[in-house]
A protein has these predicted regions:
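Short, low-complexity disordered leader/linker segments with a strong preference
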Residues: 1-40
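A residue-level marker of the well-folded mature domains of exported/periplasmic proteins
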Residues: 29-271
Length: 271
């Protein structure tokens, strides 16, 4: 899944460059000449994690860095000073001040930043990863939102001309993981999620469905069991590690599919 998301990131960056050049080249010759002299400068802003989390932030960082190197494009990353909307917005402000004209936002927590910054910086392209219509509506509407984005025009809350919100079908990766685990001979599976947010839940639901599909195919539905829990955070700690110890120990769990940033460390330590 990380490889697939990395490939998608490369495609999105290429599309951002193409869109930028196309937008600049449709006016007078002088404007086209000026635009040709402007070079793309890419920035990435991390969410609550870091570029060494061996998860979403690190994958995004490495994909941006590799693409920048391959295409001779300057790239920098910014880590907000705290886990807050204000800090993330401040990092975007700093990236723009440093000359970035394509900014990659890593995670659903950037919905408020997309709303606030896309109109403020109309000449900057934003790639918002895992930011869904529901995330935008929840932050844009606030109190009174009925949690059905289909009831609203999401583009009322951000500048659609310079923002691309990219979400993924995590349930497909989850399905393949659950299916493969059962086909490889595991019968007692576990799913450890981070916070119970849509992307994590899609991984989990797919995992359960994949395990169930494999069990039905093998005719062993009464033998396959799945433990399921979300830790409520995107990092491992002693409490979650202890919880995983009970899974591997007294419950007899054989394999754990961990999804949610650094929370995987607790499953790995317990194993």
């Amino acid at each position: 899944d990380a490889i697939m998301k990395r490939k998608i990131m490369v495609v999105l960056l290429a599309a951002a460059m193409t869109g930028s050049l196309a937008g600049c080249g449709s006016t007078q010759n002088k404007n086209a000449a000026d635009a040709s002299e402007e070079k793309m400068k890419v920035a990435m802003v991390t969410d609550s994690g870091d570029i060494t989390d061996q998860s979403f932030n690190q994958m995004t960082y490495e994909a941006c860095k590799a693409w920048g190197k391959e295409n001779d494009i300057e790239f920098n990353y910014y880590k907000p000073q705290s886990d807050s909307d204000e800090a993330r917005t401040a990092s975007v402000d700093q990236a723009v001040a440093d000359g970035a004209n394509v900014i990659v936002l890593s995670g659903y927590v950037f919905a408020p930043t997309v709303i606030d910054e896309s109109d403020l910086y109309p000449e900057v392209k934003f790639l918002a990863l895992d930011v869904s219509a529901g995330d935008i509506c929840e932050k844009g509407i606030g109190e009174g939102y009925d949690y059905n984005p289909d009831h609203y025009n999401v583009t009322d809350y951000y500048n659609e001309d310079n923002v691309y919100c990219c979400t993924y079908q995590e349930e497909l990766s989850g399905f393949m993981a659950g299916y493969a685990a059962v086909m490889l001979g595991y019968r007692h599976l576990g799913f450890l999620g981070g916070m119970s947010v849509p992307a994590v839940n899609r991984y989990g639901y797919g995992y359960v469905q994949g395990a169930d599909a494999a069990a039905k195919e093998l005719g062993i539905t009464d033998e396959v069991q799945v433990e399921y829990v979300c830790g409520g955070q995107f990092y491992g700690d002693a409490d979650i590690t202890a919880y995983m110890d009970t899974w591997y120990g007294s419950k007899g769990v054989e394999v754990v599919f961990a999804c949610g940033g650094g929370i995987y460390t607790s499953a790995a330590e317990a194993a």
